[in-house]
Amino acid sequence: MTPLVALAVLIAAITHASWNAIAHAIKDQLLSFTLISGGGLLIGAAMTLFAPFPAAAAWPYLLVSAALHVAYMMLLMRSFTLGDFGQMYPIARGTAPLVVTVLAAVFVGERPDGWATAGVAVASAGLVGLALWGIRGSGKRPHWPAIVAALGTGLAIAGYTTVDGVGVRASGTPLGYVAWLMVLEGLAIPAYAYYRRRAELVAQLRPFAVRGLLGAALSVAAYGLVLWAQTRAPLAPIAALRESSIIVGAAIGTLFFKERFGAPRIAAAGLMVVGIGLMLHTS
């Protein structure tokens, strides 16, 4: 992984944590994710007007990925409804890197070398440490339905990361791929919200429109950067490096949601930094 690719993934991590924090801050999660999905749909539709059309070989991956992204959004919405940001976000993000490493090795034939493997393992240990501290440090008993939803979110992340890693390479155009992905995945949650809220939906969305659309723009930018990176580096290190967003999420939780950071999170963040350094050793 080159420094430029690593920088792109780190920017994506910051952007991703930011849009997740915006989503969590809107208390009605159905409204929050309707705005983010619907905003992504509008942005993606605009991008299709000038982005190259993805190659035919990419479309099976686009369709599967869109379904996985919808599942991811629904599970993330449920985990944010049931649990605290400082617990749910690291569990969801921390599950993905090791699963992606296995999936990429089995289905894509990308077997990481020793440095990358060590980096993924150490970074993932840091992520798991942050997640466990979120459970134990909160002073609350674990809320298992929320944790299961967060784990399911992580599995969905691993699934679409692997699918998109193959699909974007087959597409010939990362920009066109992300544009059509946003269009395909952006229909489901707004349709579900309309089914649930009917005529009241527009009035309920209006107070949160600016924040929600900002979250949508950040979401598209974050994943576009990741897709570009996946055309230039193996999937597993990108997945692990992307999850440095948990450090940003912990900082956001401390500053804006008044959650404690503490020594355990600092130690876990240190493991993340070591893991990132090991992954970059291969560049």
What kind of region is each of these model predictions?
Residues 1-64, 73-85, 125, 132-149, ...:
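Membrane-interface interhelical linkers
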Residues 13-18, 45, 66, 70-74, ...:
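Hydrophobic/small/kink-forming positions within alpha-helical transmembrane segments
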Residues 64-69, 81-128, 176-184, 235-255:
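Specific alpha-helical transmembrane segments that line the substrate/conduction pathway
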Residues 44-54, 100-115, 155-170, 218-235, ...:
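Hydrophobic alpha-helical transmembrane segments in multi-pass integral membrane proteins
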Residues 38-44, 101-105, 115-134, 264-283:
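Hydrophobic transmembrane alpha-helices of multi-pass small-molecule transport proteins
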Residues 205-207, 251-272:
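Interfacial loop-to-transmembrane junctions
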Residues 152-182, 188-192:
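Flexible, substrate/cofactor-facing loop regions flanked by secondary structure
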